[in-house]
Amino acid sequence: MNKKDLSDRFLDEIKRNLMEQEEDDEEDENESEETQDEKGGSSDFDEMISRLLHSQTQVHVFHLGTKGSGSYAAHKALQGYYEGIDGLVDGLVESYQGRYGLVTNYDSYEMDKFESVEKCISYFNDLNKIITEKRDSVKDSYLQNQIDTVQELLFSTLYKLKFLK
């Protein structure tokens, strides 16, 4: 083999290595984009989690302010929610973070005073709309199941507020 053949082979080998490296870089980039696609818009997830975290304190405020007809049943229903939601949201966020990384974009919201059981019912209906709209920000079945459990608690609370006096 002459010197030119060796040089050509060497250049071909370098080109092949560069092309493989570019392909690997593209695959890594595509995998990163796929992970983002699987995750969905994290801002929707962040908002849902922020609302759920806020709901614990908001419902506790409603609980402490209950008064009037049917207030004991409402008081106990609201207590069941704010005591139950903490562990559910904590588990949901930890599961999400184990797969996708830390949630860091939390929002805070103003608190409302207790006005009536009807206002509490309206609050839970609005919260459910947010959960329903934002839950598709994650596709994983185990995260969807955890969101189902949150909605289960929400609807159980709504039942108690509407029908138990």
Enumerate the language-model features and the residues they cover:
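Intrinsically disordered, compositionally biased, charge-dense segments
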Residues: M1-E47
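A structural signal for well-ordered alpha-helices, especially hydrophobic packing surfaces
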Residues: I49, Q56-H63, V89, V93-Y96, ...
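Conserved alpha-helical segments that form or flank metal/cofactor-binding pockets of metalloenzymes
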Residues: Y72-V103
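Acidic/histidine-rich alpha-helical segments that form the ligand environment
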Residues: S108-K162
